[in-house]
Structures are given as structure tokens and as C-alpha cells.
């Protein structure tokens, strides 16, 4: 969700129902992104993000990229891996 002034955007990373318009009401605020900053551009609440991913939320390509940069996507993939039972 784009916020901010003209030429100085900030973005909210949110969980939204797929039937709601793009900038409509969101379910949960997961984090925010400020591309104008040199450091700490992105702040994500990992607990909330993992909760929604485990519930089946599908992140956009851009959000998945942000999750990868912060290491959150790797944690999610590792939590989904199940040990394979060896047959004798």
C-alpha cells in the first residue's frame, strides 16, 4: 500500500483479502518499507508475517523478494519442510 508525499513514497506491507481493492481495508499490518532511507529500509514483524504465511497467504513477487532479503522466506520454507520417512 503506497503512502507518503509526492516523490517520497513509503509502503506498508499488509495482509489483504483478495476480494478487496488494492488500497482498500487491510486485515493485518506486517511491516513497512521506506526506499528513501540508506539503511534499514524495510521493517517486518516476522511473527505476524510467518503467521499469515502459515495460514496460506500468498505474497506478491515484490514482497517475497523483501522476505528473501530479510531471511524470512528461508525461515518459512524451512518450517514447511517435513522429514522424509525412510522405507526399509
Curated annotation (Swiss-Prot):
InterPro entries: Ribosomal_bS16, Ribosomal_bS16_dom_sf
Pfam families reported for this sequence: Ribosomal_S16 (PF00886)
Entry's Gene Ontology cellular component terms: cytoplasm; small ribosomal subunit
GO biological process assignments: translation
The keyword RNA-binding is assigned to this record: no
Keywords: Ribonucleoprotein, Ribosomal protein
Domain of life: Bacteria
An example Gene Ontology molecular-function term: structural constituent of ribosome
Keyword Isomerase: no
HAMAP family: Ribosomal_bS16 (MF_00385)
PANTHER family membership: 30S RIBOSOMAL PROTEIN S16 (PTHR12919), SMALL RIBOSOMAL SUBUNIT PROTEIN BS16M (PTHR12919:SF20)
Family assignment from sequence similarity: Belongs to the bacterial ribosomal protein bS16 family.
Protein name according to UniProt: Small ribosomal subunit protein bS16
Organism: Mycoplasma pneumoniae (strain ATCC 29342 / M129 / Subtype 1) (Mycoplasmoides pneumoniae)
Amino acid at each position: 500500500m503506497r503512502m507518503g508525499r509526492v516523490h517520497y513514497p513509503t509502503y506498508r506491507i499488509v495482509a489483504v483479502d483478495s476480494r478487496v481493492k488494492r488500497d482498500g481495508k487491510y486485515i493485518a499490518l506486517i511491516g513497512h518499507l521506506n526506499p528513501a532511507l540508506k539503511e534499514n529500509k524495510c521493517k517486518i514483524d516476522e511473527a505476524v508475517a510467518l503467521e499469515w504465511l502459515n495460514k496460506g497467504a500468498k505474497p506478491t513477487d515484490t514482497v517475497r523478494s523483501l522476505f528473501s532479503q530479510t531471511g524470512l522466506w528461508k525461515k518459512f520454507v524451512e518450517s514447511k519442510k517435513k522429514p522424509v520417512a525412510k522405507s526399509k
